């Protein structure tokens, strides 16, 4: 689960990190009033969306007057912001962050991720702040400095000092950086984060450090024990189909093809998408129904897939392990009838009672195309999609 910038900064402040004074606003009038409460002559106004590249897309501006701030809010609230990280529709803007402008002398980068290979939290710091860190990692990896935190021990001050020295910080800046490092390390573990970034972490004209932007991603598997963070969830930033899938514990990712895919198991789902591509088709989605391919879950999966108008055919690829293929076949038939599927449906069953499952499909009164192999299924669904 992602957080907005203003939410990330709220957490930063909770752990004693320096952040600009700012207010998240729902209306243009609130933005106008917030601008009046900020002491600096210039105010920064930012659209709050779960995407980068806001500045280049016009979603971040600097204003001298309260009226300018209000006009910005009127322009964007209720609209969609399209950036290089969004699709063509963009992300809806429901909040505007109004905050004090900062006197920036230099920009740094500070971030942290979980390194699954070492089972540690790895902090990354660079003097190249304010730019795409992936580009820096590819072109000049020597400019990125790392420090690994053992989650059983927690962040240590000496690790923060080492990074501060590598960043060229001096004097009181080192103490400030260590405080930021320690706070982020504690936050990462306490809130079950998967990723955090401060980009940029700026050095102000007065020589102080300031968290100018913030990005936080929380491990969705840990949300059950993070009630505070659950309340920060903004469903408006999610694809409607993906949100629907999450309610049914279905793993769904929308793509831009015309062949809907319903599979049990992430690995099999990826293999299915590959073979559809191999035979000239384009998958419309990744959808893993998991181990419990019940009639109800299959029906919801069909609803999600068919809510995409680009879908011209659906491939159901199920491997029956614990769940028998004949039971899965009955569930598919019931789901097709319930949903009223109008596009061709190709079904490939393999595993426990696969022959019986195919017999159930063949004897049903619904129009389902049975496949005897994965290659056969891919060829049939691609042909069906092209014929529509």
Curated annotation (Swiss-Prot):
Disulfide-bonded cysteines: none
Record PROSITE patterns: ATP_GRASP, SUCCINYL_COA_LIG_3
First-tier enzyme category under EC: ligase
Assigned keywords, A-Z: ATP-binding, Ligase, Magnesium, Metal-binding, Nucleotide-binding, Tricarboxylic acid cycle
UniProt-recorded name of the protein: Succinate--CoA ligase [ADP-forming] subunit beta
Name of the gene this protein is made from: sucC
Any one GO CC term of the record: cytosol
Record PANTHER family: SUCCINATE--COA LIGASE [GDP-FORMING] SUBUNIT BETA, MITOCHONDRIAL (PTHR11815:SF10), SUCCINYL-COA SYNTHETASE BETA CHAIN (PTHR11815)
NCBIfam families: PRK00696.1, sucCoAbeta
Annotated cofactor note: Binds 1 Mg(2+) ion per subunit.
Any single GO BP term: tricarboxylic acid cycle
Positions of the ATP-grasp domain: 9-244
Metal-binding keyword on record: yes
HAMAP family recorded: Succ_CoA_beta
Keyword Transmembrane helix: no
